[in-house]
């Protein structure tokens, strides 16, 4: 336990059983953190740890005011390519962050910065995929050692409006094409529903099977086919759906489920996480993107307003909806002894970004050559 000033204390938890026991407190903190996303819920993070965590790697920094949890940095220790403290959740989580109670954001951020500075004597603190306005920006602001922020992943966002309102935002010709596609869904008899809590696990497993069928014979994200990913989704989404932090929609054609979509929700954010559909929809000339977004927009519109996030990736098909581009950041923080690790990581990231630009430029030249 370390003193943090102004009545706050910071405790480092490395015990998996203690992490599991934090569920109730954690969800209270999550609800009081304005910037929290679904990827910071206890259900998501603890389930992720059960599937992906490494022995003795857990590093939970817990900020308390008396007995009340007012801040948390869910991190883990990794050794490669350099010693780092990174957020739990890994690459399958679209946003990484800490949690700070809205009534203690300033002092909580300062307390976490102090605790992480001690840890940074031997490890680089590395936050990828930081959404603008995230709580970890408070930690970064109070950091007294070497630090750097880099542009990271791209997300596309739409306002949380019903489909009819989203269509009104589009250019006239494109809006009419979308209306025609929506009308075709009706003529074909495509229906959709949000599944009940007791059906969630079965529906999630059906989603994965349809996702495999959808990508059969094509290049699929390997992790989406691995048992640990399937078990993580089934384990985490059930309690999240029960608490309103997730929703699963099924699409039916002639009484058969032909597609499933998973939405993750928190506050004013609804994120489109993963979907799967049967290839027969292609044979029926169903516009799958329109089908999915029609249901997603209705799910998002029933929330607290805010945004419908298409999450990471700027695939061309997403731009038909005229989304807003949001750039996530990477926040790197070090101490005097780990400053060389920060410099090496920044150089590596810069080199990768430059190489990608060069490759894109060559691809563009070939396309127009």
Where on the chain are the PLM-derived regions?
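Short, flexible turn/loop "capping" segments at secondary-structure junctions
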Residues: 5, 88-92, 184-187
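A conserved beta-strand-loop-helix scaffold within acyl/acetyltransferase catalytic domains
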Residues: 10-85, 130-153, 161, 168-282
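A gly/proline- and charged-residue-enriched helix-loop-helix capping module
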Residues: 90-121
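Aromatic (often tryptophan-rich) hydrophobic motifs at membrane interfaces
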Residues: 64, 107-115, 223-343
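Short catalytic-loop micro-motif centered on adjacent basic/acidic residues
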Residues: 125-127, 193-194, 307-309
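Short, high-confidence coil segments that cap the C-terminus of an alpha-helix
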Residues: 56-58, 120-122, 246, 303-305
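ATP-hydrolysis module of ASCE/P-loop NTPase motor domains
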Residues: 117-134
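Active-site/acyl-donor-binding loops of N-acyltransferases
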Residues: 2-8, 12, 137-169, 277, ...
